[in-house]
């Protein structure tokens, strides 16, 4: 004897809002419908395309994610050859949903206000050397990670953080000390929007 699976039936209340066009009359009662809930709309949120909303069948706005890797060694800190001391650049962008990551500067620029998750994984090249990497929010270091075991040739400095960002905030990595190994795409930087604020 098998157990049958039944989809739950929900009563949906359609609240008619008074629109400028005057579609609803004052004092009208909510309409109750029996059926299956297919779409839940939050009050005050647009349901058509445009800023703040997407039409049914479209991708929702605010989809933001990036992942980038290095494919070659980084110069020692302060000797990047491009005039930007210690900035870490990623020459291969694997994902750039929302176009927030700028390959030229190595920075992620927040397109929308929200809470974001960031992660980096940086591998040192040589033993007897310390690698120090800082995740920067605009010009301020937020977190740092170290790899400094003298007996390990390939050790990783890895960290992650959740940050509330405003539009235009810049998040990047800065190499404070050491060299990076990226020949096998071991050094990476990624982030995504968890939810808008």
UniProtKB/Swiss-Prot annotation:
Residue numbers spanned by region Necessary for interaction with CBLN3, and homotrimerization: 64-197
InterPro entries per UniProt: C1q_dom, Cerebellin_Synaptic_Org, Tumour_necrosis_fac-like_dom
UniProt xrefs under SUPFAM superfamilies: TNF-like
C1q domain boundaries: 59-197
Keyword set includes Endoplasmic reticulum: yes
Location within or outside the cell: Endoplasmic reticulum; Golgi apparatus, cis-Golgi network; Secreted; Synapse
Entry-listed glycosylation sites: 82
SMART domains: C1Q
Top-rank lineage group of the source organism: Eukaryota
GO annotation, cellular component aspect: endoplasmic reticulum; extracellular space; Golgi apparatus; parallel fiber to Purkinje cell synapse; synapse; synaptic cleft
Tissue expression profile of the protein: Expressed in brain, restricted to the cerebellar cortex. Within the cerebellum, expressed in granule layers (at protein level). Also detected in postsynaptic Purkinje cell spines (at protein level).
Subunit details: Heterohexamer; disulfide-linked heterotrimers. Interacts with CBLN1. May also form oligomers with CBLN2 and CBLN4.
Role played: May be involved in synaptic functions in the CNS.
This protein's name: Cerebellin-3
Species of origin: Mus musculus
């Amino acid at each position: 004897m098998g157990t049958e699976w039944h989809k739950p039936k929900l009563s949906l209340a359609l609240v008619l809002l008074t629109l400028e066009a005057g579609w609803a009359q004052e004092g009208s009662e909510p309409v109750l419908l029996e059926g299956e809930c297919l779409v839940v709309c939050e009050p005050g949120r647009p349901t058509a395309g445009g800023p703040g909303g997407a039409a049914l069948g479209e991708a929702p706005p605010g989809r933001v994610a990036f992942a980038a890797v290095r494919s070659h060694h980084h110069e020692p800190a302060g000797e990047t050859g491009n005039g930007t001391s210690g900035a870490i650049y990623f020459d291969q962008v694997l994902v750039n949903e929302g176009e927030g990551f700028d390959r030229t500067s190595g920075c992620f620029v927040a397109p929308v206000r929200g809470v974001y998750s960031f992660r980096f994984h940086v591998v040192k090249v040589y033993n007897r050397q310390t690698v120090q990497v800082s995740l920067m929010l605009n010009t301020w270091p937020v977190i740092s990670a170290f790899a400094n075991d003298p007996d390990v040739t390939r050790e990783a400095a890895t960290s992650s953080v959740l940050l509330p960002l405003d539009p235009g905030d810049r998040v990047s990595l800065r190499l404070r000390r050491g060299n990076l190994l990226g020949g096998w795409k071991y050094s990476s930087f990624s982030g995504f929007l968890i939810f808008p604020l």
